[in-house]
Amino acid sequence: MSLAIDAWARVGTVDDVPELEGRSITVDGRRIAVFRLPTGWAAIDAACPHLGGPLGDGLVAERCVTCPLHGRRFDLVTGEQHGGDDVVAVHEIAERHGEIWVRLAEPS
């Protein structure tokens, strides 16, 4: 089933993602990474724009994730690369009754 861009999709429960970790999932054929931060949740496109590294497997510190392939860091709130020009799409994310919901952004 295809989702409209403005539709919310359930992507799991709060227990699926430990704090300061990420998980990659597929929503409507699009790979995204969901992260649990001390202050809430973040969701971005799962592939690093450099060489497609799996951002969902990256190291999370404060509000950034570091790509496990080449160390590029991305802000999980803005999607911007620290010290570079690359950007990943940021998706809306919400926790409702112990479930995690995402609304996809337009592809970047």
Predicted features by range, described:
Residues M1-E62, L76, E80, A89-S108:
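N-terminal pre-ligand scaffold of iron-sulfur
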